[in-house]
Amino acid sequence: NQEPIGETVVITEPQELELADYQKLYTKLKAVAGEVNKSLVTVMAASSDTDWFNEIYESRREISGLLVGNNGVELLVLIPYEPVKDASLLQVTFVDGTSLEAVLKNYDRVTDLAIVSVNLAAVDDSTMEAVKIADLGSSKSVKAGDSVIAVGSPAGFAGSLKFGNLVAPGHKTSAIDGEYRLLITDME
């Protein structure tokens, strides 16, 4: 749980907002997103295949990942599974630009989530100082109308950013092995 930023303001009369007010709001939202970027990585997945002419070609995909753990041996990164399932090489790029080889540790086809790991011995001290393991909270306390920020690659490319609101925070869906709560936003 994060503490509110700044002081609490109680408005007793209607106020007109100026362009500068919106700019100030978005500056603060971007600052929050900037702090989260320390927990984001870019994962490059490379795979080889053969085309119709029997020529070997390599394809590369980049996706965003979230640093979710440090078990003392590896840094653990949560990513979508589909883009990496056939990869012959995985490489993680951290917020400071350092790129290191990673391995697929585990995956769940139902949720399309996977964990890749980077050997902690390969990560230098300056990179460890630049990154932060994500603080994961509980979604049980969120309400419709709460503000949300999507980071990683919500616009389809790494480093993009979107702002929005929760519209249906308690929507449930069933899958093969259970029921999941979805957080539905107004972001497109």
Please provide the spans of the model-predicted regions.
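Gram-positive cell-envelope targeting signals
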Residues: 1-7, 148, 165
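N-terminal activation segment of mature serine protease catalytic domains
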Residues: 2-67, 77, 84, 89, ...
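Active-site substrate-binding loop(s) of clan PA
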Residues: 31, 67, 103-105, 123-157
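Terminal peptide-recognition signature
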Residues: 38-43, 65, 75, 79, ...
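Short conserved beta-strand and strand-loop elements enriched in small hydrophobics
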Residues: 43, 88-96, 148-153
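Short, conserved beta-turn/loop elements at beta-strand boundaries and strand-helix junctions
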Residues: 48-49, 60-61, 70-72, 85-86, ...
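Catalytic-histidine neighborhood of serine endopeptidases
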Residues: 70-112, 120-121
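Active-site region of chymotrypsin-like
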Residues: 121-134, 162-188
